[in-house]
Amino acid sequence: MSETAAVTGSGPEVRSGGCLCGKVRFTVTGPVDDPHICACTDCAKRSGAPFQWWVGFPMAGLEWTGAEPTWFDTHPGKTARGFCPDCGSHIAALDYGGATIIGILATALDGHESDQALVPTNLNRLSEAAPWLAQVG
């Protein structure tokens, strides 16, 4: 198994990831929750792309192993997004009010391209997507 793949076995799944420059690093322990693509206008504006690929993990299983991200209140009092203050990489999303799941951008995870547990199961907010998105594929 490569270093970048999820570590499994008798214990829980552990994945690591971080930003482009390496300043922000983290590990997440626990099962994948709701891997999906979001095509909402907020995700599109933040990323400069037509959608973002999200996956949830138990909040209790998150550990920042490098610098923590800078948080931006996307929807003040409701939702924040975490990014690297140096390279600008988008890392995470957090709902306020006792959230038990943290959203991690799948592309921030090491080895995301070969981790079958991260394959998106749905496309959220298609009504806000670029009109051509549903035609691609």
Residue ranges and their predicted role:
Residues S2-G137:
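A short Gly-Trp-Pro
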